[in-house]
A protein has these predicted regions:
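SH3/SH3-like beta-barrel fold
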Residues: 136-141
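Structural detector for short beta-strands of small beta-barrel domains
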Residues: 112-134, 162-167
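Primarily interfacial, aromatic-capped hydrophobic alpha-helices that serve as membrane anchors
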Residues: 63-101
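Beta-strand/loop nucleic-acid-binding surfaces
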Residues: 143-164
Length: 167
């Protein structure tokens, strides 16, 4: 764990994501693996100065990342998930977006949706759904992607209400 000393949220997430992928593969308990892993990640993060906020991760996203990581421990889905849960700006953006999507007349159940932040350098194509103070939400074939407000000016509108952003 010395490698985690003074780690950035992204460095922490990359290492913790690989460990979590391997724990998922081993599946050490008949019951309670998810709760045990959540407690382990929270404590590991705390020990190295990171707040791991898994409340911003939907069940669908966790299941998807877990399946990908079980099939390939080096798959980046779990690291991306943990980056969203650990990097403060990403976690705040997801929390605000989830509150927005989960309230009002157009509210939808969120736990069955994959909701994530856009990765730096990623191209996002989707239908614009919502804007909060921190991000804009685009519905893509793979789920809902939160894009930082500063990057929304790069959106190029296309036919059918689609927008394409190069971040």
């Amino acid at each position: 764990p010395d490698v985690l000393k003074n780690s950035t949220p992204e460095q922490f997430a990359a290492i913790a994501g690989k460990v979590l992928n391997e724990l998922n593969y081993v599946h050490p308990f008949r019951e309670g693996n998810g709760r045990t892993q959540e407690a382990f990640l929270s404590e590991l993060g705390r020990q190295y100065g990171h707040n791991v906020d898994l409340s911003v991760i939907t069940r669908a996203r966790m299941v998807s990342a877990s399946i990908a990581g079980t099939q390939d421990p080096d798959h980046p889905a779990m690291a991306a998930l943990l980056t969203d849960a650990t990097a403060p700006a990403r976690a705040r953006a997801l929390k605000e977006l989830m509150q927005d999507l989960g309230s009002g007349p157009a509210a939808r159940p969120l736990d069955d949706l994959v909701i994530r932040t856009a990765a730096p350098g990623e191209t996002v194509s989707g239908i614009f759904k919502s804007r909060t103070s921190l991000s804009g939400a685009f519905e893509t074939p793979d789920g809902i992607v939160a894009v930082p407000v500063a990057d929304l000016r790069n959106a190029v509108r296309q036919d059918g209400g689609y927008a394409v952003l190069d971040l």
